[in-house]
Structure formats: structure tokens, C-alpha cells
Amino acid sequence: MEGGCKVIITTSREPSKKTLELVNDLVNSLPGTSKIVRGKKSFITLLEEAVACGARYIAFIWERRGMPFALLFYDVINREWKPYMLKISGIKTRREFPVFISRRPPAKSAVIVDLSEGEVGDIFTEIFGYPILYSLDAVRGLFDTVVLIRRTDGYLVELLGSDLGPRASSIRIKKVVYRHV
């Protein structure tokens, strides 16, 4: 990966602690990602930093009323927004799990296991570039992070460790919204 990162993860301005914790968990769990602290930076400044890093995409976590609300993607090379937005209906941080989950060392490998066989797995594969499988049995102990996508009312995206136990926050996606860009 050129420059050490393929995807930059950032937030809207002045994010809440919960959103920052989600960003930190994602960066620690997903290889090839890094974060940019937004602060008061303009969109152009974010693009310049992404180009300097060698990133292909920027993942924005938008928030509303202090909670992550949507995940949007910007293609740095083609200079255009991706035509989909993942609406987040809730997240569960490491602190909210019933057992203590310590922060693990940064992941070096990842795989997507899409049990829902829906569009979220394809979107994650396109953005992050991880291989996609449709069975959980084949991945135990082979990857540092397993991105498990299950169908609920929407989708549930869980970041699991190599032992298939929780590694980081889980994200509940209400729906995928396709928009005209």
C-alpha cells in the first residue's frame, strides 16, 4: 500500500467522544486505514492530506445529535462521492459489551464474512479491498480481523478478532441509501 494507508477515516467537525471511539476502533481493527483528526480543516485540506498519504478513499462518519448517523465515502482519485450512504442506526462500543474487551494490537490482515449476502459486503470490499467470504467456518485463526456482516432489521457489522470474539465496536446499519451525486 502506497504511503501506508488505503482509506482515511475522519469525522464531521467537533465529533462526540462516542464517534471518536468508533474511529479509533476502526483504525485499530482495519488494516490499511488511518485517521485524520478533522478539527476545523476544510474539505480541500482533507483531500490534500489524503493525497499525501496515498489514500484511495476517505470514509466520513457524519453525526447527528452526538451520535454517528451515516458513513459516506469519497473517491480521492476520481474526485467524486460514491453514490451510496450507509445510515447508522446505532453503535456498540467496547465499553458497552457485557465482558471486558481490551484493545488489541493493530490488525495486519482482515477478511469480510458476509452472512447477509447483501450490498454492504460489496461496498466494504470495494472500499477497503479485503477478500469477501460467505461462511464463518473457513476463517477461524487466519485473519487478525473478521468483519462479520449479518442481516437484522438492517445490517449488523461486527469487528471480530481471530478467535471470533469481539475485537472492537459493532455498527448497526439501518439501510443503504443510494443518492444522485
Swiss-Prot record:
SUPFAM superfamilies: Class II aaRS ABD-related. InterPro entries: Brix, Brix_dom_Rbsml_bgen_prot. Keywords: Ribosome biogenesis. GO terms for molecular function: rRNA binding. Residues 5-181 form the Brix domain. SMART domains: Brix. One of its GO terms (biological process) is rRNA processing. HAMAP family: BriX (MF_00699). Probably involved in the biogenesis of the ribosome. This is Probable Brix domain-containing ribosomal biogenesis protein. The lineage of its organism: Archaea, Thermoproteota, Thermoprotei, Thermoproteales, Thermoproteaceae.
